Amino acid sequence: VRPLVGAEYAALGINDPQGRIERFVTSGMDDETRRRIGPLPEGYGLLGLIIRENRSFRIADINVDPHRHGFPPNHPPMSSFLGVPIAVQGVSLGRLYLTNKLGAAEFSPADQALVETFALHAGIAMDNARLHEQLQRLAVVDERERISKDLHDGIIQNLYAVGLSLED
């Protein structure tokens, strides 16, 4: 989505069931810069605002926004901001964060609409991936249960055969 709206940086924050950021995937930032920044964001400031209010925010300059929490050392400068929640059937899965609109002072309402549509599709894809993962786990459990029953039945048959042999 970063090139679609002309953002210098983008991130996908995936949250755990409690709403905290558990994965933070960045785009537009090289690995060395990402490493120097340090640990994942914890969801304070603007990132936390989107988590708490679960709605989109378009901000012209995050450096003067009252919700700003600040940047860690070695973080690249950022100004314009667009944050959009990702949800499916009312369940929050994560957020898209975009910063530094290229060629304009801030993100437009059209940019926001595009990212919200993208977030809808991303939410469906993320939900499908989670469902697929759950199905794989269930398949493994089913297979283990089948093997367990086969072993159990085989052992019972062997014990019965041994019992018959002993009676003989």
Where are these regions (language model features)?
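Coiled-coil dimerization/phosphotransfer module
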Residues: 3-25, 30-41, 49-52, 59, ...
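Active-site/binding-pocket entry motifs
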Residues: 56, 64-68
